[in-house]
């Protein structure tokens, strides 16, 4: 399995960058991981939020591999437990899926058009997280899913 991660904008907070690197290293023990960061648009007085969302969404769409199962993180998406995520991943593998692509948006999220292109809309929680924090939480949950699938004791 190969995991593609598409992030909008750089992770600015050092503690989050360090956590992301830690969990990328852990996750790479189980699967191939490729991270693509697309440039975020600057939101100024003159710019319109809809233009920013459309532009960032187009960049993300261009970065998604054609043969990947495309997952958009969205607060209206499906919520899963950690075990549920692991079982969902296993079912995809059993159907022949070899690539997953997770997209984490910028501060304004994604366009409805990009959401409609996703095979799965995934919510990390009912709570709201910053887009940068969502990256770290997603990586930890993907790592946790790998340990669950292999019966390892990280998940208690």
Features from the language model and the residues they span:
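Conserved strand-to-helix beginnings and helix N-cap segments that scaffold or border functional pockets
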Residues: 17-20, 82-86, 115, 135
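N-terminal beta1-alpha1 ligand-phosphate binding loop
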Residues: 1-27
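Short glycine-rich anion-binding loops that position phosphate/pyrophosphate groups of nucleotides
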Residues: 11, 75-78, 106-109
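Conserved RecA-like P-loop NTPase ATPase core
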Residues: 5, 71, 105, 138
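S-adenosyl-L-methionine/SAH cofactor-binding core of RNA-modifying enzymes
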Residues: 32, 36-100
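Short glycine-/polar-rich loops that comprise or flank the Walker A/P-loop
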Residues: 1-3, 31, 68, 117-119
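Structured adenosyl-cofactor binding patch, chiefly the S-adenosyl-L-methionine
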Residues: 108, 112-156
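Short hydrophobic segments within beta-strands
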Residues: 6-8, 36-38, 103
